[in-house]
Amino acid sequence: MAAQRVFPLSCVVQQYAWGKMGSNSEVARLLASSDPLAQISEDRPYAELWMGTHPRGDAKILDNRISQKTLGQWIADNQDSLGSKVKDTFNGKLPFLFKVLSVETALSIQAHPNKELAEKLHLQAPQHYPDANHKPEMAIALTPFQGLCGFRPVEEIVTFLTKVPEFQFLIGDNAAAQLKQSLSQDSEAVTSALRSCFSHLMKSEKKVVVEQLNLLVKRISQQVAAGNNMEDICGELLLQLHQQYPGDIGCFAIYFLNLLTLKPGEAMFLEANVPHAYLKGDCVECMACSDNTVRAGLTPKFIDVPTLCEMLSYTPSPSQDRLFPPARSPEDPYLSIYDPPVPDFTVMKVEVPGSVTEYKVLALDSASILLVVQGTVTASSPTAQAAIPLKRGGVLFIGANESVSLKLTVPKDLLMFRACCLL
């Protein structure tokens, strides 16, 4: 009899302090829906759901006929289930980590090193850089999702330098003048000027940052109290971040970085060396399996300023250029594919109207993980010994080259996301 290669998973929840509290969190709601025994504490944060084999959150297999207890153990014993190319390319390991995030307070402004730099940093400082892999990542909004991503067009930064004297003070007159001059120069001059400005900010003395930030917060608060709109200098966002991280250098980074609000289904892709921060909302996220982060602010953690200023990609672009649109599948009218320019992962979104009663999940030459966000189905496959019921929050592992038939058991629209590796 064929070994079972399709089975449900119980996934690990991370309760980081920045997560949404209790049942306000999409992570908690997915957990409560999929596990009738789950008890949600309204006074605890539910930040991330991890779907994968990462040692800090290896998914448990919900099928007692399978001897291995976790997905990581099972894949180690069944490497062919990864798909032949994936197995060879990624040394018999699942190359991606799939997540749901529920963000209440801002995550640190950060960037992830490319493969070459990751290897170097890991050798030099393994306590800060725990592995030698790169960490490209993609976020797809489930609810309106706010984030900072990549450097703004220089014109916008120059406008902020004029309108926010506290920002100009920290950058310094020379670096600010260099940035203004670069507007009429080539891209190399822009990159150099932007690096100089950002480095000046990041290397500012803590005492001076706190003084200037307090001046700015006081000024914005007084204007808001007088009924004035301060959106031209991102007043509301600055006050929000200052309340969350008082005196933090990262509060000024909003004048360098694009502010994006993704609508549900919209995505942003964060390649190596792009500065970014998630601010608020719920999303599905997929990334290469790595834990390397170089932080720049909005954090009490270690900030490696020299590495950060050296590694960043100082390429300004308008915020709409940071959006990563999916492609519609030519074979399947219900399928959208988010396929970023890295080999480690691809995410598929499946939206099936409630009027449809059956849906076939295509076989791929890659292991994949399927998450049900809305809807109720029963899954069956040639190797599964019995039908597998899945409702909102349910997670299914699908081995390479396995097809799965889904029966929609409730006439409601079905929304699912599937992470895989298309080489």
Curated annotation (Swiss-Prot):
NCBIfam families per the UniProt record, alphabetical: manA (TIGR00218)
PROSITE patterns xrefs: PMI_I_1 (PS00965), PMI_I_2 (PS00966)
A single Gene Ontology CC term: cytosol
Names of required cofactors: Zn(2+)
Species of origin: Bos taurus
Task of the protein: Isomerase that catalyzes the interconversion of fructose-6-P and mannose-6-P and has a critical role in the supply of D-mannose derivatives required for many eukaryotic glycosylation reactions.
TM region(s), chain numbering: none
Residues bearing the modification Phosphoserine: 102, 108
Gene from which this protein is expressed: MPI
Family in the record: Belongs to the mannose-6-phosphate isomerase type 1 family.
Annotated protein name in UniProt: Mannose-6-phosphate isomerase
Residue numbers of N-acetylalanine PTMs: 2
Binding site for Zn(2+): 110, 112, 137, 276
Cofactor note: Binds 1 zinc ion per subunit.
